[in-house]
Amino acid sequence: MLAVCVTVVLGLLSVSGSQAAPLTCEDLLRPLELSSTLGKWMYIAESSDRPFWEQILYTLLHSAWIEFYGIGIPHQNAFGFGCSRINSNFTLHDNSTWTSVSPIPVTEVLLTTCSDCLLTLEKWDEDGKTYTSLTLYSRRRELTATELDFYKKQVDCLSLPPATHMEGEHLYCSSQLVEDAGRSL
């Protein structure tokens, strides 16, 4: 009987010892290096403290994606009235922070997130106020509940309002369509 009790106690200790410690806000907001960000990323969710941002996104933006080329970031957006392309050049300050100047000056930091996701913490000034946004992108159109919960915790750490999520069934502008639209602007 003593052997059974010892086995049970040791078993419980090994299970409880193998559970990961809860992540702190410092862990959740750790900068990520820019090295593996080249390529296309689908817009998944965004949270911002800018007034009416959620309504703007929900009403106008149907889908979006960005593509990193190393020298610029074209943003592809599908609005209710069609597709558009915005090219942003950026200045890299270190391996995880950059500033873009178009269409408005924005400082962005890449943060830790799921393995095939990209998370940007953005800060910009508008009308004399500084605003913060946390935007989640992925190489996939849909994320797991665990991955979205991780993002929600990051939003909470920044005391931002709940995020606006793109629905997985929204269509994304094709690369050719956006290139054609970009030439016509």
What does each model-found stretch correspond to?
Residues 1-185:
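A beta-rich soluble binding module of mature secreted/lumenal proteins
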